Every structure is written in structure tokens, then in C-alpha cells.
């Protein structure tokens, strides 16, 4: 069990207009989102079971589920005291910065099947959903969004390069992120 009742992440960047124009010219949502001010204040609860055995010739199970909630306490407090919303963003601020408001849950299930004393097959299913709430109701914060590809996902693809369909826009960098993820893969591990 892992319980972290309070996690606070504050991003407050002072950007001069030349730099702002430069990052906007890239037309890259990943870069633009990396330089937006925001606060994530919430907690995380997770349960992890690891029955892995170092022996290659054995079968084992790994399971982890995580639940994360952010912004709910702040939002309810601001509603209770009738704090006025920021007219530019139509949202509440914390320390003058807009804060995220969401709930997110994930499940990671892996089964390790021993084939011999030097090889295994790993079956993996990963699923998650994030639900944006009232203060930022259109999407999860960029760093909390789901994506496929990369070292902790489907390793043969770059991070954020897999997504709906096979759309590729050569004029823009199209990062494929979302609020829902369902991923399954099969991997064979053996010495080279």
C-alpha cells in the first residue's frame, strides 16, 4: 500500500514575449503545455502486489492499481466561501495560478510465464481513465494525460507517437495524448 495524502506541484514560469512567440511558432502542444502555469494539489493512493520470482523458469504475477485525485478540496472550499473566479480563465486560482481538478485511476496487470531457465513471456494489460472536473473541465493537465509508446509502454515506438488512427501531419508535431488508455502487449525476454 502506498498513500500520499498531499502532493503539491506548482509551475509558475515568467516568460518574456520573445520566448513566448518562439515556442508558439513551433506549433507543438507538448512544448506549449510544458510552459503553462498551473498547480496540481491532491493525493495518491496505490496498491501493488509483486509476486515475481528471480528464477526464469517460474510463473508470477504483478498487479498495481492507483487512484489520484486533485483540486477537489480547493474547489469545494472556493465554492463554500463564494470566491470569485478568474474572469480570463473562468476558473478558480490558488496563489494566483489556475489549479487542476481531476480524478484518475489506473490498473497495471502483468503475468510472467517461464519458458526455460533463460527465457520468459510477459503478458501485460494497462488501463486507465482520467476525468477532468469543474475547475478545468475540458482535459487533464498535460503531464497527467495518458500516452502510448516509450520505455514504460510499447517500447518499439517513441513516447506519444501512437494514437488514434495513423494520422500524421508533417506541418505540426502531433502528440497523441488522451484521458483514456487501454494497452495490451506481449513480450518475450531471452538472452542475446
Regions found by a protein language model. Give the residues of each.
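C-terminal outer-membrane beta-barrel translocator/porin domains of Gram-negative envelope proteins
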Residues: 2-192
